[in-house]
């Protein structure tokens, strides 16, 4: 029975994950309905753009410039660079760029209080925000130049409270694990987010999220003690019946980079997993009205524990497969998870083709071979990060493990 339950759990998780990834292709009308507007309204809404940063000397100055260069009237934009006092390098880069721009609407907010976390900095930025709409870009982001026109038009036309636009990692071939990391983002924002929005339970992405300031203030801003403040805010927006819109087009994604080492990747994924665990035990998701919303929230938030469980049980399952005699029907059943993994692998190959085509890059058979070889090691890394997240949560460790950025998506390698 124990072995049977492991198999059922693995099969369910694999099939539902495949369902999420294929949703937008199964129902292409959702993609059409959530396209960016082709004709922009005259700029009307004002925007406050929060740029939190920590130890981002390598990328921050260029990011401030790229955000300032967005195709939108400068008098309708407020840009707030957010740094902590103990980060003189990033502060110096930000101040140098702000002095160069010479625009009073581009400001530097320096704080020295606690907690030391991204959402705390965001809340301080919210206190001085003047825009009708508040948004966040990460320190290495490259938003599309027309993103504010898109959001301005979308929010006015649909009387929308919040918009999640697409985010995409771009350096798919700089490290062996980058292929699958890039595809996670590709499927998540292109397909899965539309499924979440349809159900009415949307764990928001970390940036390129646009929320009306008054609503954000009513909700109390971001949870300063949560490691995934974006997803937690998404739950509260769903509870408040906010009118949320998902927009995804490959042309308009905000470009980012993957972590540049396996250690950085594990630390990043650990933080995300632990944040989901925090939200799970906060129990706010249980207040969602519909059973489908609560079940979906539970599935998304329980994934870290499921991955950790798989990491523990997989060796046990392998030992039992070779040394325990099973009935024929159960022995045949043990191959179903393998078939699901193979299907997921082919789906990743198809996703790589779609990603390359969408961003005008050439298909290379060598890259597809690397993806295939990396598939199972990548799953083990995810399981390790999940185990680490569970361990940290049990231990009571919740410090913010920062992901370093070096601008890989801005180099020729990422092309």
Q: Which residue stretches match the model-derived regions?
A:
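Short, acidic, metal-binding catalytic loop of nucleotide-sugar glycosyltransferases
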Residues: 65-76
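Catalytic donor-sugar/metal-binding loop of nucleotide-sugar-dependent glycosyltransferases
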Residues: 235-254
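A conserved acidic beta->alpha catalytic loop
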Residues: 83-94, 113-115
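Cell-envelope/extracellular polymer assembly enzymes that use nucleotide-activated donors
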Residues: 45-48, 78, 232
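Membrane-embedded multi-pass helical conduit in multi-pass membrane proteins
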Residues: 38-41, 300-395
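Long helical/loop segments within the catalytic core of UDP-sugar-dependent glycosyltransferases
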Residues: 98-103, 108-111, 115-127, 131-132, ...
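N-terminal membrane-anchoring/stem segments of glycan-assembly enzymes
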Residues: 1-43, 348-354, 382, 388-393
């Amino acid at each position: 029975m124990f072995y049977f339950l492991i198999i059922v759990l693995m099969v369910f998780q694999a099939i539902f994950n495949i369902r999420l990834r294929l949703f937008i292709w199964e129902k292409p009308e959702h993609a059409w309905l959530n396209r960016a507007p082709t004709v922009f309204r005259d700029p009307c809404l004002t925007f406050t753009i929060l740029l939190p940063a920590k130890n981002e000397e390598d990328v921050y100055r260029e990011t401030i410039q790229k955000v300032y260069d967005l195709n939108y009237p400068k008098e309708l934009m407020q840009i707030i660079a957010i740094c902590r006092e103990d980060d003189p390098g990033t502060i110096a880069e930000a101040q140098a760029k702000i002095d160069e721009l010479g625009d009073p609407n581009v400001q530097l907010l320096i704080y020295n209080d606690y907690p030391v976390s991204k959402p705390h900095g965001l809340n301080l930025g919210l206190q001085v925000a003047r825009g009708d709409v508040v948004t966040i870009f990460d320190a290495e982001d490259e938003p599309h130049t027309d993103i504010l026109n898109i959001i301005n038009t979308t929010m006015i036309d649909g009387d929308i409270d919040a918009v999640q636009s697409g985010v995409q990692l771009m350096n798919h071939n700089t490290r062996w694990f980058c292929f699958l990391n890039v595809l996670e983002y590709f499927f998540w924002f292109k397909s899965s987010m539309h499924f979440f929005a349809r159900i009415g339970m949307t764990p928001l992405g970390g940036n390129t999220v646009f929320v009306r300031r008054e609503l954000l203030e009513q909700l109390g801003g971001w949870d300063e003690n949560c490691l995934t403040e974006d997803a937690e805010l998404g739950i509260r927006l769903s509870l408040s019946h906010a009118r949320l819109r998902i927009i995804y087009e490959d042309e308009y994604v905000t470009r980012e980079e993957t972590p540049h080492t396996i250690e950085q990747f594990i630390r990043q994924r650990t933080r995300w997993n632990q944040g989901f665990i925090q939200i799970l035990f906060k129990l706010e998701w249980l207040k969602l009205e519909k059973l489908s919303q609560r079940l979906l929230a539970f599935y998304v938030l329980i994934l870290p524990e499921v991955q950790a469980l798989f990491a523990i049980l997989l060796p046990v399952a392998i030992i039992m497969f070779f040394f325990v005699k099973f009935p024929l029907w159960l022995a045949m059943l043990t191959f179903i998870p393998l078939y699901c993994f193979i299907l997921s692998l082919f789906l990743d190959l198809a996703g790589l083709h779609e990603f390359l085509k969408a961003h005008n890059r050439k298909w290379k058979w060598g890259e597809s071979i690397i993806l295939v070889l990396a598939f199972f090691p990548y799953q083990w890394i995810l399981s390790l990060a999940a185990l680490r997240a569970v361990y940290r949560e049990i231990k009571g460790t919740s410090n913010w493990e920062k992901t370093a950025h070096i601008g890989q998506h801005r180099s020729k390698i990422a092309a």
